[in-house]
C-alpha cells in the first residue's frame, strides 16, 4: 500500500521509455496513457469509461494532494536541527496522510460500485498496478 501511495503521488512525474528515447510525460499525457491502458486491460466499455474516469481522476487528485502534504512533512525532517518532538509531528502527519488516503480509497470504492461491477473494479485495480509496474520497469532500463 505504501509503494502504491508513493507511485500514485509521483506517477505524473515518472519517465516513460519508448525504445531508447526517454520522454517526460506531462500530467495530461500520463493520464491519457493510463486511461487507455486501464480501459484495455480491464475491458471497460466506452460508456463505463466515460462515467468511471472522472471519478477515478478525482480520487487521484485528492490522493496526490495528501501525498504532496506527506512529502512536505518529510522534507522538514532533512534539517539537522529537527528535534525529536518535530520528528514525532512529522511522522504523525505522514501516517495521518496514509490513513486518509486509504479512507478515500474506501469511499471511492463505494462510488465505483455505482458505475462498475465488482469484477470490473477488481480488473481496474489490477490494471492500475500493472501499469505502474510496467512504467517502473521501463524507467529502470
Q: Which residue ranges define each predicted feature?
A:
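Amphipathic alpha-helical segments
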Residues: 34-115
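Amphipathic, charged alpha-helical segments and their helix-to-coil junctions
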Residues: 20-24, 102-141
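Bacterial N-terminal signal peptides that target proteins for export
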Residues: 1-3
